[in-house]
C-alpha cells in the first residue's frame, strides 16, 4: 500500500509542478484534482496549488529539462527565498500525505478485511475442491499402485519360481555335464589304450599279411597244379560218362528186346524149360523195377493197367530207398509248360529232362494201388527241401483229374502248399479253379489251383537274379514265399506198401 501511495504522490507532484506553458482555468485556481483507479476502487486527490503563474525560463544558465515551478519566476538573486519557499511547500505536502495515508488506512481497513475474507473463502473453497480432487486422484492412484504392486508381486513370485526352476535345471545340467566330462575322460583313456593295442595289432597284422602272401603264392601254385589235374580228371570222367550212357542205352535196348521176346513167347505159347509155361509179369511202376533188381536211376518202360501201350518213365532209385516213379521234373527252363488240356492229359517232354508224365497216366497208375507222393524242391541258393504225402491219387478226366491228398510231412513248410481237401486241374483252355480270375492264364501252366492257391510247380521258369517278385513262377509258398521262383522241382510217386 505504501508503494502504491508513493506512486500516486509522485504522479500528483509531476502534474502539479510540470511547466507546459498552459494557463489554468479560473475555476481550478488554488486547487487541483487528481483521480486514480485501482481495481474496483477509485481515489480522488485534492492537491493545493500556489498562487501565481509558472514562468518559462528564458535564460540559458538553467537546465532546459527543469520542472515547472509553483512559485513565480524571480530573479536569481532571490534563490534563497525560493528554496525556503520550496521547503515550506514540501513540508506542507509531507504533512498532507501523512494525513492522506492515515485516512486511506482507516478507510481501507474494512474493505481490505472484506477482500481478505472473500479471498480466504474463495481460496478455502478452491483448496477444498483441489483437496477433494487430490484425494480422489490419490485414492485412484493408490488403487492403481496397489494393482501394480500386486501384479509386480505376482510377477516377482513367478520370476522367483522360474529362477528357482532354472537354478535346479542348471544344477542338474552341471551335474550331467560333470558326469559326461568324467565319461569323456574315461573314454579318452580307453581310446588311448585301444590306439596302443591297434598299433600293436597293425604290426602283428602286417607280419601275418606277409606270411599270408607267401602262403597265397604257394597255394596259387598248388591250385594251378590241381586245376590241371582236375581238368584231366574231368576229361576222363566225361569219357567214362559217355561210355556209361552208351552202356545204359544198350541195357535199355536189351531189356526192351527181352520184354518183346517174353511177350512173343507168351503169345506163341512157347514152353520154358521143365515143360512149364510161365507168364511174364510186366513192370507196373518203378517200384516193380527196383524190386526186380534194377537199382540204378534212369529211364525204364512200364506197363500201366488199362493203357494200350507201355510208357517210358524216369525211375529215381536213390532218394529215400528208391522205387520212385517221376511224374514231373523242372530243372533248366528248356521246356514250355504253358500247355493246353490235351497235352497235360497225355504228357509232354523227355523223361531224361524236363517233362510231365500226363494226367491220364497218373490217374491209371494211382488207380492200380495206393500211392504216396514226394516233392523235391531246390532254391537258387542250393537249399533243398521236400514235402511228402502218405496218400495220393487223382480222379479221371470227367472229374477234372481232381487231386486227393492225406498226411503231410516234410521240410518245405509246416503247412501243405497243396490243397489237401481236393482241387480240380486247370489249364489255359480249361478253367476249373474256384476263382473268377482264371488262375491258369494269370499264373501260367497247368495245376491244381483251387483259388489260385499257394503253389504252382508248372509255372514260368525264371533264371537266377530274376526269380524274385514273380507271382507266375515256380512257387511253393510255405518254402520260399508266394513270389520266389524255384530252381528245380521233382514230383514222384511210390506204392504205399513198398
From Swiss-Prot:
<feature type="disulfide bond">
    <location>
        <begin position="286"/>
        <end position="315"/>
    </location>
</feature>
<feature type="coiled-coil region">
    <location>
        <begin position="81"/>
        <end position="119"/>
    </location>
</feature>
<dbReference type="GO" id="GO:0050731">
    <property type="term" value="P:positive regulation of peptidyl-tyrosine phosphorylation"/>
</dbReference>
<keyword id="KW-0225">Disease variant</keyword>
<dbReference type="InterPro" id="IPR002181">
    <property type="entry name" value="Fibrinogen_a/b/g_C_dom"/>
</dbReference>
<dbReference type="Pfam" id="PF00147">
    <property type="entry name" value="Fibrinogen_C"/>
</dbReference>
<dbReference type="GO" id="GO:0005886">
    <property type="term" value="C:plasma membrane"/>
</dbReference>
<dbReference type="GO" id="GO:0002040">
    <property type="term" value="P:sprouting angiogenesis"/>
</dbReference>
<dbReference type="GO" id="GO:1900747">
    <property type="term" value="P:negative regulation of vascular endothelial growth factor signaling pathway"/>
</dbReference>
<comment type="subunit">
    <text>Homooligomer. Interacts with TEK/TIE2. Interacts with SVEP1/polydom. Interacts with THBD; this interaction significantly inhibits the generation of activated PC and TAFIa/CPB2 by the thrombin/thrombomodulin complex.</text>
</comment>
<dbReference type="GO" id="GO:0030097">
    <property type="term" value="P:hemopoiesis"/>
</dbReference>
<feature type="signal peptide">
    <location>
        <begin position="1"/>
        <end position="15"/>
    </location>
</feature>
<dbReference type="InterPro" id="IPR037579">
    <property type="entry name" value="FIB_ANG-like"/>
</dbReference>
<dbReference type="GO" id="GO:0001701">
    <property type="term" value="P:in utero embryonic development"/>
</dbReference>
<protein>
    <recommendedName>
        <fullName>Angiopoietin-1</fullName>
    </recommendedName>
</protein>
<dbReference type="GO" id="GO:0043122">
    <property type="term" value="P:regulation of canonical NF-kappaB signal transduction"/>
</dbReference>
<comment type="function">
    <text>Binds and activates TEK/TIE2 receptor by inducing its dimerization and tyrosine phosphorylation. Plays an important role in the regulation of angiogenesis, endothelial cell survival, proliferation, migration, adhesion and cell spreading, reorganization of the actin cytoskeleton, but also maintenance of vascular quiescence. Required for normal angiogenesis and heart development during embryogenesis. After birth, activates or inhibits angiogenesis, depending on the context. Inhibits angiogenesis and promotes vascular stability in quiescent vessels, where endothelial cells have tight contacts.</text>
</comment>
<dbReference type="GO" id="GO:0048014">
    <property type="term" value="P:Tie signaling pathway"/>
</dbReference>
<dbReference type="GO" id="GO:0005615">
    <property type="term" value="C:extracellular space"/>
</dbReference>
<dbReference type="GO" id="GO:0002092">
    <property type="term" value="P:positive regulation of receptor internalization"/>
</dbReference>
<dbReference type="GO" id="GO:0001525">
    <property type="term" value="P:angiogenesis"/>
</dbReference>
<keyword id="KW-0325">Glycoprotein</keyword>
<dbReference type="GO" id="GO:0030210">
    <property type="term" value="P:heparin proteoglycan biosynthetic process"/>
</dbReference>
<dbReference type="GO" id="GO:0043524">
    <property type="term" value="P:negative regulation of neuron apoptotic process"/>
</dbReference>
<feature type="glycosylation site" description="N-linked (GlcNAc...) asparagine">
    <location>
        <position position="122"/>
    </location>
</feature>
<keyword id="KW-0037">Angiogenesis</keyword>
<feature type="glycosylation site" description="N-linked (GlcNAc...) asparagine">
    <location>
        <position position="154"/>
    </location>
</feature>
<dbReference type="GO" id="GO:0002719">
    <property type="term" value="P:negative regulation of cytokine production involved in immune response"/>
</dbReference>
<dbReference type="GO" id="GO:0030971">
    <property type="term" value="F:receptor tyrosine kinase binding"/>
</dbReference>
<dbReference type="GO" id="GO:0005576">
    <property type="term" value="C:extracellular region"/>
</dbReference>
<dbReference type="GO" id="GO:2000446">
    <property type="term" value="P:regulation of macrophage migration inhibitory factor signaling pathway"/>
</dbReference>
<dbReference type="GO" id="GO:0072012">
    <property type="term" value="P:glomerulus vasculature development"/>
</dbReference>
<dbReference type="GO" id="GO:0062023">
    <property type="term" value="C:collagen-containing extracellular matrix"/>
</dbReference>
<dbReference type="Pfam" id="PF25443">
    <property type="entry name" value="ANG-1"/>
</dbReference>
<keyword id="KW-0732">Signal</keyword>
<dbReference type="GO" id="GO:0043116">
    <property type="term" value="P:negative regulation of vascular permeability"/>
</dbReference>
<feature type="domain" description="Fibrinogen C-terminal">
    <location>
        <begin position="277"/>
        <end position="497"/>
    </location>
</feature>
<dbReference type="GO" id="GO:2000352">
    <property type="term" value="P:negative regulation of endothelial cell apoptotic process"/>
</dbReference>
<feature type="coiled-coil region">
    <location>
        <begin position="153"/>
        <end position="261"/>
    </location>
</feature>
<feature type="glycosylation site" description="N-linked (GlcNAc...) asparagine">
    <location>
        <position position="92"/>
    </location>
</feature>
<dbReference type="GO" id="GO:0010628">
    <property type="term" value="P:positive regulation of gene expression"/>
</dbReference>
<dbReference type="InterPro" id="IPR036056">
    <property type="entry name" value="Fibrinogen-like_C"/>
</dbReference>
Amino acid at each position: 500500500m505504501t508503494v502504491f501511495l508513493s506512486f500516486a504522490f509522485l504522479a500528483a507532484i509531476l502534474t502539479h509542478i510540470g511547466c507546459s506553458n498552459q494557463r489554468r482555468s479560473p475555476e481550478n485556481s488554488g486547487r487541483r484534482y487528481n483521480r486514480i483507479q485501482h481495481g474496483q476502487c477509485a481515489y480522488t486527490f485534492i492537491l493545493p496549488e500556489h498562487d501565481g503563474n509558472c514562468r518559462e525560463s528564458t535564460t540559458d544558465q538553467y537546465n532546459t529539462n527543469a520542472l515547472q515551478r509553483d512559485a513565480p519566476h524571480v530573479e536569481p538573486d532571490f534563490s534563497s527565498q525560493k528554496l525556503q519557499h520550496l521547503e515550506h511547500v514540501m513540508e506542507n505536502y509531507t504533512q498532507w500525505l501523512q494525513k492522506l495515508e492515515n485516512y486511506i488506512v482507516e478507510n481501507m481497513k474494512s474493505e481490505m478485511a472484506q477482500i481478505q475474507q472473500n479471498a480466504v473463502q474463495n481460496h478455502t473453497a478452491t483448496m477444498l475442491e483441489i483437496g477433494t480432487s487430490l484425494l480422489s486422484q490419490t485414492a485412484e492412484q493408490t488403487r492403481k499402485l496397489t494393482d501394480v504392486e500386486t501384479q509386480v508381486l505376482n510377477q516377482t513370485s513367478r520370476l522367483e519360481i522360474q529362477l528357482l526352476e532354472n537354478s535346479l535345471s542348471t544344477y542338474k545340467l552341471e551335474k550331467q555335464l560333470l558326469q559326461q566330462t568324467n565319461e569323456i575322460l574315461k573314454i579318452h583313456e580307453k581310446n588311448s589304450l585301444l590306439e596302443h593295442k591297434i598299433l600293436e595289432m597293425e604290426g602283428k597284422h602286417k607280419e601275418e599279411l606277409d606270411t599270408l602272401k607267401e602262403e597265397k603264392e604257394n597255394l596259387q601254385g598248388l591250385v594251378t597244379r590241381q586245376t590241371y589235374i582236375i581238368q584231366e580228371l574231368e576229361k576222363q570222367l566225361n569219357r567214362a560218362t559217355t561210355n556209361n550212357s552208351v552202356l545204359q542205352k544198350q541195357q535199355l535196348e536189351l531189356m526192351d528186346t527181352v520184354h518183346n521176346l517174353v511177350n512173343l513167347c507168351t503169345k506163341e505159347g512157347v514152353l520154358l524149360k521143365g515143360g512149364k509155361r510161365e507168364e511174364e509179369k510186366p513192370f507196373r511202376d518203378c517200384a516193380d523195377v527196383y524190386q526186380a533188381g534194377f537199382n540204378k536211376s534212369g529211364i525204364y518202360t512200364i506197363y500201366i493197367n488199362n493203357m494200350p501201350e507201355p510208357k517210358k518213365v524216369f525211375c529215381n532209385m536213390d532218394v529215400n530207398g528208391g522205387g520212385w516213379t517221376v511224374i514231373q521234373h523242372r530243372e533248366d527252363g528248356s521246356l514250355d509248360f504253358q500247355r493246353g488240356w490235351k497235352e497235360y492229359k497225355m504228357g509232354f517232354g523227355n523223361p531224361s529232362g524236363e517233362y510231365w508224365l500226363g494226367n491220364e497216366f497218373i490217374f491209371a497208375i494211382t488207380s492200380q494201388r495206393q500211392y504216396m507222393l514226394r516233392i523235391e524242391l531246390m532254391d537258387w541258393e542250393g537249399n533243398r527241401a521236400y514235402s511228402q504225402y502218405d496218400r495220393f491219387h487223382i480222379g479221371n478226366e470227367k472229374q477234372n483229374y481232381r487231386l486227393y491228398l492225406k498226411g503231410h510231412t516234410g521240410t518245405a513248410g509246416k503247412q501243405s502248399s497243396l490243397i489237401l481237401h481236393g482241387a480240380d486241374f486247370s489249364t489255359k483252355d480249361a478253367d476249373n479253379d474256384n476263382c473268377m480270375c482264371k488262375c491258369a492264364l494269370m499264373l501260367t501252366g497247368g495245376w491244381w489251383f483251387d483259388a489260385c492257391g499257394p503253389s504252382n510247380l508248372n509255372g514260368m521258369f525264371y533264371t537266377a537274379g530274376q526269380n524274385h517278385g514273380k507271382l507266375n513262377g515256380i512257387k511253393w509258398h510255405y518254402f520260399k514265399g508266394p513270389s520266389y521262383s524255384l530252381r528245380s522241382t521233382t514230383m514222384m510217386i511210390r506204392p504205399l506198401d513198398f
